Amino acid sequence: MGFLRRQLREQFEKKKPEALQADIRMISGCQDVQTSADVSNVSSFQLPDPAGNAGGACTSTLLNVLYKDHQTPEDTMSFVELLNKMRENLEAKGFSQVPQLTASHPIDVNDDFDLVPPAATGTRRALLIGINYVGHEQGVLRGCHNDVKNMVEYIKAVHGFEDENITILMDDGEHTAPTHANMIAAYKKIVALSKADDALFCHFSGHGAKIRDDDRGEEDDGYDETLVPIDYHENGMIRDDDLYDILIKPLVQGVHLVCLMDCCHSGTVLDLPYVYKADGNFTEMEIDENFDFKKLLGKFGIDDFDKFGGEALGKINGDALGKVGKDALGKLNKFFG
């Protein structure tokens, strides 16, 4: 990691907004620019008693890696090893998507991975959403219900989640329908119930999309990343800004949230600042070169961005840092004070 990036990370950690003090980690099936596959036959992933023949490539390969690791409890598996094994499994089956980890804190990716962090000694709660878009003329998926069923079996058998603390939304006619309103309500509920030391797990398997940025004008590429509810035609999609406001911002310090997003364009759907990609170019978590500090600060009512050195704090990418050099660091120090 370059000197300026390291300085930026140190300063950001000192003055990070209170809303990012919770321990938040997200595994996504692909980067923002990529799509995530729906697999018609998951038998090659060798899951124990899979709930069906179809499934999402990300969920299926993650479970494959985790079950194998669980069979040898004497061995440990780091974040790096997890993501690399996922990437290798996906490549072996012909998928080009690159799994990545984003987080609210700069995790040491050589530390042991656990879906429930050891520090999470409180209640274990889970919210799982699987949408096959049953009845739609286009975009019907086959594997999302199976993803949820398989993941529920895993978190119960391996991590001790109890049925009373597991919420499932699926468009199968049996569970609560994953409408826009129901998804928002479910995310709000799991946050409202959470207390320090609790472990939260949120899983989404369905369509993700990129749509034109709303009037906040925050996205560098002009697009928001979204989750696609069953009723998106009538009630719209759930934007990354919405997810941040209802799922990330309200979490209290001491809560441990792990999210699995098995959908297209999911790399930054939670707008978290730190990233590690299993593409061979990362050795540690870095501040995402596409992370927008202006967007983050805007969520906390800091509108006079230029006053605090916006040139250096907009999109922190290599070219920008190279152009402003030492002046950038001065502006960063002035901003974080």
From Swiss-Prot:
The modification Cysteine sulfenic acid (-SOH) is found at C202. Signal peptide: none annotated. Keywords: Autocatalytic cleavage, Calcium, Disulfide bond, Hydrolase, Metal-binding, Oxidation, Protease, Thiol protease, Zymogen. Transmembrane segments: none annotated. Its EC number is 3.4.22.-. Residues 1-6, 116-125, 290-337 form a propeptide. It comes from the Eukaryota. GO terms for cellular component: cytoplasm. Changing C259S: Severe reduction in catalytic activity. The active site is at H207, C264. Gene3D superfamilies: 3.40.50.12660. Activated by Ca(2+). It holds the Pfam family Peptidase_C14. One of its GO terms (molecular function) is metal ion binding. Disulfide bonds join C202-C259. GO terms for biological process: proteolysis. InterPro entries: Caspase-like_dom_sf, Metacaspase, Pept_C14_caspase. Ca(2+) binds at D224, D240, D241, D271. Auto-proteolytic cleavage into a large and a small subunit which probably remain associated by non-covalent bonds. Following oxidative stress, the oxidation of Cys-202 leads to the formation of a disulfide bond between Cys-202 and Cys-259 which enhances catalytic activity. Belongs to the peptidase C14B family. Cysteine protease that cleaves specifically after arginine residues. This is Metacaspase III c.
